[in-house]
């Protein structure tokens, strides 16, 4: 018996499941909500195929159900399906709301990462611009003085005028922030700031959770932030 090829990543496992169960899984486009307990159905149906283990199946399912396209598909009126595409009941409101929050948090994380990357790019561009704009000091040729003839009177040297050094302009003081050391001391509605690279965005505390603090930015977006990214 020939050895079956082994799937090495969760993406490869998802591609295999989409080919094996096309009425349930999809490799692209909006995904359909899965039946509750579908993991055990997968174990029963694909046990031994492609050398798949339970750990691989569980990791692939976690990646699949946390993807944006799957979360978009979890909406009011949508129907869960089993491995063969048979309907298994409509989604309840609690699952729809949970998926909506997951999608909002995922988008907020991506936006925060992009803002941090853009801030770093601006800093790098500003640093490069300062180096290019700095003028190089040209050396002036030293004036040649005629040699004094023998017997000629020695003229007193003219005193050099002392050049005043240009006043240095003090750089504006950076705004000092106090890090949040204990999130349990925060209160709902309290104003603070969220660090994103070198910038700090104003925010308001909405909720204190076990994973961090849910805050709302001035833009209206809400996200969960860990304590090390919060300052006063």
From Swiss-Prot:
Molecular function GO terms recorded: RNA strand annealing activity; RNA strand-exchange activity
Highest taxon listed in the record's lineage: Bacteria
GO annotation, cellular component aspect: cytosol
UniProt cross-references to Gene3D superfamilies, sorted A to Z: ProQ/FinO domain
UniProt keywords, alphabetically: Chaperone, Cytoplasm, RNA-binding
Keyword Acetylation: no
Bias kind Basic residues: ranges: 137-146
Compositional bias (Basic and acidic residues): 117-136, 147-177
Listed SMART domains: ProQ
Protein name, entry field: RNA chaperone ProQ
Function: RNA chaperone with significant RNA binding, RNA strand exchange and RNA duplexing activities. May regulate ProP activity through an RNA-based, post-transcriptional mechanism.
GO BP annotations listed: post-transcriptional regulation of gene expression
Compartments in which it is found: Cytoplasm
Pfam families reported for this sequence: ProQ, ProQ_C
UniProt similarity note: Belongs to the ProQ family.
UniProt region (Disordered), positions on chain: 105-182
């Amino acid at each position: 018996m020939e050895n079956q090829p082994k799937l090495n990543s969760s993406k490869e496992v998802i591609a295999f499941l989409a080919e094996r169960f096309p009425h349930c899984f999809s490799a692209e486009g909006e995904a359909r909500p899965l039946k509750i307990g579908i993991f055990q159905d997968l174990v029963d149906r694909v046990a031994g195929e492609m050398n798949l283990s339970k750990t691989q199946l569980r990791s692939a399912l976690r990646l699949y159900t946390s993807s944006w396209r799957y979360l978009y598909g979890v909406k009011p009126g949508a129907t869960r399906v089993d491995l063969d595409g048979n309907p298994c009941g409509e989604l309840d409101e609690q699952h729809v709301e949970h998926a909506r929050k997951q999608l909002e948090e995922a988008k907020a994380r991506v936006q925060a990462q992009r803002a941090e990357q853009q801030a770093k790019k601006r800093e790098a561009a500003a640093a490069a611009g300062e180096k290019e704009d700095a003028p190089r000091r040209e050396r002036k040729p030293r004036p040649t003085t005629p040699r004094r003839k023998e017997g000629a009177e020695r003229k007193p040297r003219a005193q050099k005028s002392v050049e005043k050094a240009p006043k240095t302009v003090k750089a504006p003081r950076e705004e000092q922030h106090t890090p949040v050391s204990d999130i349990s001391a925060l209160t709902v509605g309290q104003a603070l700031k969220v660090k994103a690279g070198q910038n700090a965005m104003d925010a308001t505390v909405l909720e204190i959770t076990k994973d961090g603090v849910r805050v709302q930015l001035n833009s209206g977006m809400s996200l969960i932030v860990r304590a090390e990214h919060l300052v006063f």
